[in-house]
Amino acid sequence: MNTADTRQRLLDIEKQIASLREEQATVKAQWEAEKELIHTSRRLKEELEDLRVQAENYERSGDYGKVAEIRYGKIAEIEKALEENNRKIEARQASGDLIMKEEIDAGDIADIVSRWTGIPVSKMLQSERQKLLGIESELHRRVVGQDEAVRAVSDAVKRSRAGMGDEKRPIGSFIFLGPTGVGKTELARTLAEYLFDDEDALIRIDMSEYMEAHTVSRLVGAPPGYVGYEEGGQLTEAVRRKPFSVVLLDEIEKAHPDVFNILLQILDDGRLTDSKGRTVNFKNTIIIMTSNIGAQLIQSEMEHLEGRDADAALAGLKEKLFQLLKQQVRPEFLNRIDEVILFTPLTRENLREIVTIQFNRIKETARRQRITLEISDEALMWLAKTGFDPAFGARPLKRVMQRQITNRLSEMILAGQVGEDDTVEIGLENDAIVMKKK
């Protein structure tokens, strides 16, 4: 970074500090004014109580003149002042500008508990109600073209938080079927972030690591005397530490059959006992299992899914996939799953939306380097067309955007062609992506 850039950065920081100091002065003045109002309210209440005690003492001693003077003079005057002071506090509270409160309420406690623990409070506040009502539209912002999956997951969460779900079982349990790259993992990640304000609330376990019988015990912990006993189970320990989470079991069809015995207990009772004898509560988790069962069948049916008989073809495909699933998974396990959801292959229209989502992520990364990215509609369309591969979903698109935008932008930064506060235009010329400094 050269001297001019350093000087400009220093000026920007000084302006920001000056702005923050001005904001601090305003907030401090407001805080002092509110503090004075609350202090006045307390003082007047104390004076009122003292005068009432005095009036009672004079009444017992028979001095009714003093009683009348206090009750109909001084007390009335202080009550009027207290009412006026309370009116000012209520006016600030109604406008939403109140910083301080004389008394804390249930909402304040709920907010602090949620902030400290990351656990949503049992009594739904108005803000949480709005958040839950908007869950479907929020999930649609990041997961494209999977309406049935988004609706099913949203309904399960709403049932649970409204108190209408089964209290003895997890919030929801789902099997996601579908080809690779269509949003199965992305939906789980988005759900964890939206519900618990933290992507780390997603507990992801790759079931291909549990293909052998001797590996199954690692889910609940090694038995006493075996290596790894002190570490706890990979599933139970993760949920014990984060009881409010989304549990993603990737590629469930690869797991050893004994794994389903463990999962059966979770789906039935909402709890599991680890190797140390501790009972782990799964009642506040969402269990999502993904599977690539029938991926080849889906690819072979692709041409029918985009035709006029798309709905009929999709219904037939679902039935075939369910039959394949029955061959891999025991009936008693499937009966305890809330829903088996088919993720449909992405269309060209879906990919256009995904291009915008992916580009916004690249744009945000560049913004942190103080570089602005702008892209034309033609370039977005070209990326969607080039990255479209029905067999592999959105993953080829991510590679195309990395190759065409991220890699080339990195080279421009390293070569000194682009620096802080610059704008880079991304367009299309001669059927190729071009990047120019504005």
From Swiss-Prot:
Region NBD2, residue ranges: 128-345
Disulfide-linked positions: none
Binding-site positions, ATP: 178-185
UniProt keyword Chaperone present: yes
Role: Part of a stress-induced multi-chaperone system, it is involved in the recovery of the cell from heat-induced damage, in cooperation with DnaK, DnaJ and GrpE. Acts before DnaK, in the processing of protein aggregates. Protein binding stimulates the ATPase activity; ATP hydrolysis unfolds the denatured protein aggregates, which probably helps expose new hydrophobic binding sites on the surface of ClpB-bound aggregates, contributing to the solubilization and refolding of denatured protein aggregates by DnaK.
Subunit structure: Homohexamer. The oligomerization is ATP-dependent.
Name assigned to this protein: Probable chaperone protein ClpB 1
Organism: Chlorobaculum tepidum (strain ATCC 49652 / DSM 12025 / NBRC 103806 / TLS)
